[in-house]
Amino acid sequence: METQKNLNTYLIHQRRYFHMHPEIGFDTYQTASYIYNELKNLGYSPCYLLNKAAVVAKLNLGKEKTIAFRSDMDALPIQELNTIAYKSTNSYMHACGHDAHMAILLTLAKAIREHLNEINYNITFIFQPAEEGPLPGGSKKIIETHLIDDIDAFFAYHVTNKLTSDSIGIKVGAACAAPDLFDLTITGKGCHASTPHL
């Protein structure tokens, strides 16, 4: 059985690896390859999606219902200025926590392997690229594959510095902001810039 200390060590190792090797958008091939191989090493049979930019692993335990856990994978086009030992090795950065999300999901997959007799659901693990863009984003593309049509409940998560590391915040429905594009037309009379509505 994995001890909590071993799982913590595994989690930290994974997070630091992902932090050092960020990729953006749908160009997450090395990240997906790493996740694919790690899941194979943990005893899963993962498959690639979206031209090998995404990874899904299904654990079919013959249960009536299926739950899914999802992690985003992509980084941002930001140059990291930190001087930490596991600093990004390229011109991108995991500045939004996706490195932690992938590490958490791999650690969950590892822990579940140790507790199969206690699991009451089939489980699907989803590693999704392009959460930060480009549109239409990775989630829509994964949905269009129909590989996740059998899921009864879906769990996603996001790290935050508003909670301590030993806490989990739960909210039904939307919990984080998301960007969107829209057009706005304002019609009015010309006038002084301080009061364009008059």
Predicted regions and their residues:
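Histidine/acidic-residue-rich, glycine-tolerant segments that coordinate divalent metal ions
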Residues: 83-93, 119-198
